[in-house]
Amino acid sequence: MDELVKALERAGYLLTPSAYYLLVDHFKEGKFSLVELVKFAKSKGVFIIDGDLAYEFLQFLGLGVPQEIKESYISTGEEAEKTVESQETRASELEEGGVSQVSSGELQELKEESPEISTTEEEIGGLELVQSSISTGSEVEYNNGENGESVVVLDKYGYPILYAPEEIGEEKEYSKYEDVVIEWNPSVTPVQIEKNYEVKFDVRQVKLRPPKVKNGSGKEGEIIVEAYASLFKSRLSKLKRILRENPEISNVVDIGKLNYVSGDEEVTIIGLVNSKRETNRGLIFEVEDKTGIVKVFLPKDSEDYREAFKVLPDAVVAFKGFYSKKGIFFANKFYLPDVPLYRKQKPPLEEKVYAILISDIHVGSREFCEKAFLKFLEWLNGHVESKEEEEIVSRVKYLIIAGDVVDGIGIYPGQYSDLVIPDIFDQYEALANLLANVPEHITMFIGPGNHDAARPAIPQPEFYKEYAKPIYKLKNAIIISNPAVIRLHGRDFLIAHGRGIEDVVSFVPGLTHHKPGLPMVELLKMRHLAPTFGGKVPIAPDPEDLLVIEEVPDLVQMGHVHVYDAVVYRGVQLVNSATWQAQTEFQKMVNIVPTPAKVPVVDVESARVVKVLDFSGWC
């Protein structure tokens, strides 16, 4: 990765391709420093350094730009005005301490319901703001190399990649695993256990109606804004109901009615977190509901401070405290939707039954652990090495696959060179040929991920059938959405690919991809699979928020980050089911260490991981 791009990324700035080509030679020659460039961008109130800003910066330093480069990389006229307007808007949002989002001011409908309860920083008792350690993430520029131009994109871990048009080499020869045939070991007898499963929730079960616009000629942008308005209203309504089930939460008041509350009356407000800032005396939140917006101060000595510090933008939370007529809500308690401390126990099962959890197979990748996966298929067919494993495999009835089943096409710059199967149709055919070796008495549940042929934004209803047709034809396969809830013998398994982990890692200091169980716990506490709008995870403009965890599951399975982990939080088993892809060259460069070919075995009765199979020796 180029030194200039990487250094700016660490400083929280993005460099467009046009700016890169204007600046890189001067930077390498030592004609300016990174500090000078960052200070200049900061003075302009922008976080994206484009060609126009780069040219202005070079003029400021008295450095020339060749005419042919100037014509190629600097915009003029209307285009430049749009760029400045866009960046000024974004800078204004960042100064407010928030993340660019529809819910915090762009939705006119929400504004018109009640006037905002606003305040100024000076009114918060002279609290001195300090530089926040809470990252707001980075924007992603997706131009996909149109007209042969390079673009800056971020990979799944948030690192920028300089895109260059790929040169497609000679046609590749590859296997689609048509000759792979693995038969059941006749010396092992599968236990006859009646299957008991139900797809309790699937995105396709929900009939979503498009939002209404004021007139029949409504523009596409207006429709999308209305859809996001409906989405945030849906989220607030669902999570508010969950919060009100907490016996500690009482005397709930709408934000728009706080002016009618006496200063000595303790009340509770519930709303979306628009922004969060750290001060030398505590945290300042901007919280919004359908009736208004208010500033909330939580002191540093509060027992809930650490939990509040970890909350993500756009999460729904509750504060208990007192409202000042100066326009500040002084909180003494903070609540997340969270998981109840006590839940009703499920009745025991008559027979032991097991489920296998895997994800991120990445068929088609050069780093796909083919030998390890074949060994896994042999294991599923009873080719085991101990009596203990024989007892387990004879009782395995379910295989759950949580997305990224193939490596995909055009997912990231330069991917073609990383593929052994460069055809998306053939990738799914190869996958189907492999999964055809899963014994028929094992039911497979297969959902999509961001590498799959499916809607890029979450939730993902299913695979695109025209590409993934071969896996739809598997007799013992059930295609599910991302997310989905599967009920196995009365136990609820929440299955999601896990992209929301990215935002948690970006916003919460101390959490990493290397231990994904902890970010998964934070998502469960917030009862949402991807709370932050405008972060690293694209969220579809559906009129209902289907990413809310409305009912507490017995087990949560995710993947995406390629690292195995398993933790239990308040009786809920959380599992990240790792990957079947070995470490790629890019992962080596950024010190991402996957744990491939590790397979958790779950006892369905207890919904707990009881064994982890390790096939990494063949990877």
Swiss-Prot record:
Record field: catalytic activity? DNA(n) + a 2'-deoxyribonucleoside 5'-triphosphate = DNA(n+1) + diphosphate; Exonucleolytic cleavage in the 3'- to 5'-direction to yield nucleoside 5'-phosphates
Translocase: present as a keyword of the record?
A: no
Q: Which InterPro entries does the record associate with it?
A: Calcineurin-like_PHP_ApaH (IPR004843), DNA_pol_delta/II_ssu (IPR024826), Metallo-depent_PP-like (IPR029052), NA-bd_OB-fold (IPR012340), Pol2_small_arc (IPR011149), PolB_N (IPR054750)
Question: Can you list the GO cellular component terms from the UniProt entry?
Answer: DNA polymerase complex
Which regions form coiled coils? none
- List the keywords (alphabetical): DNA replication, DNA-binding, DNA-directed DNA polymerase, Exonuclease, Hydrolase, Multifunctional enzyme, Nuclease, Nucleotidyltransferase, Transferase
**Residue spans of biased composition, Basic and acidic residues class:** 79-93
Record-linked CDD domains:
MPP_DNA_pol_II_small_archeal_C, PolII_SU_OBF
Q: Name one GO molecular function term.
A: DNA-directed DNA polymerase activity
GO biological process terms, alphabetically, are:
DNA catabolic process; DNA strand elongation involved in DNA replication
Where is the segment annotated Disordered? Answer: 78-122
* Known EC number: 2.7.7.7, 3.1.11.1
Superkingdom of the source?
A: Archaea
Q: What is this protein for, i.e. what is its function?
A: Possesses two activities: a DNA synthesis (polymerase) and an exonucleolytic activity that degrades single-stranded DNA in the 3' to 5' direction. Has a template-primer preference which is characteristic of a replicative DNA polymerase.
Name the family. Belongs to the DNA polymerase delta/II small subunit family.
Quaternary structure (record): Heterodimer of a large subunit and a small subunit.
* Protein name, entry field: DNA polymerase II small subunit
